[in-house]
Amino acid sequence: MQQSEQIVVGRIGAVYGVKGWLKVQSFTDDPESIFEYSPWLLSQKTEREMKVVEWRRHNNGLIARLEGISDRDEAARLTGADICITADELPALADDEFYWRDLIGMRVVNTNGYDMGVVEQIMPTASNDVLVVKANSNDGFGKSERLIPFIQSEYVTAVDKEAKQIQVEWPSDF
């Protein structure tokens, strides 16, 4: 694997059975798409590249057998490991689509030019994602945090990846 930013896409769970199968917790939108990435870089105390030999759905979860792991004891050493891929393995997005990791840390400015702060995290909701913007320490309206719905063309008017800035139609005092 190339030296590139690592993205955690899942975690190895408990051992399943005696033949080296492991439960897999996927963080991908479609849980099964975690198996489209290969090899996985398992990160625990050390890092180790592993290939999935086979996988299947089990009850409401996923289980997998990894190359070179053939018994319960070998599998147990991997429990709790993060499943990582490199950022360049992520699928390309349309111009109006963004990975959360790319939005976090961006400066948010409203259409009046007021610096609202920096995206600290993103909250998923049933209807849309919400930007959690940490306000500047000298915010003129005494805000410490703003919650701004990430709805493009309604509240989010522009995202400039190169300038690391999001422009929003949002009142400065809200």
From Swiss-Prot:
Compartments reported by the entry: Cytoplasm
GO cellular component, as recorded: cytoplasm; ribosome
Domain PRC barrel span(s) in chain numbering: 95-174
TM ranges: none
InterPro entries linked: PRC_barrel-like_sf (IPR011033), PRC_RimM (IPR056792), RimM (IPR011961), RimM_N (IPR002676), RimM_N_sf (IPR036976), Transl_B-barrel_sf (IPR009000)
Keywords of the record: Chaperone, Cytoplasm, Ribosome biogenesis, rRNA processing
rRNA processing in keyword set: yes
PANTHER family per the UniProt record, alphabetical: RIBOSOME MATURATION FACTOR RIMM (PTHR33692:SF1)
Domain notes: The PRC barrel domain binds ribosomal protein uS19.
Similarity field: Belongs to the RimM family.
UniProt subunit comment: Binds ribosomal protein uS19.
Protein function: An accessory protein needed during the final step in the assembly of 30S ribosomal subunit, possibly for assembly of the head region. Essential for efficient processing of 16S rRNA. May be needed both before and after RbfA during the maturation of 16S rRNA. It has affinity for free ribosomal 30S subunits but not for 70S ribosomes.
NCBIfam families recorded: 16S_RimM
Name recorded for this polypeptide: Ribosome maturation factor RimM
Organism: Idiomarina loihiensis (strain ATCC BAA-735 / DSM 15497 / L2-TR)
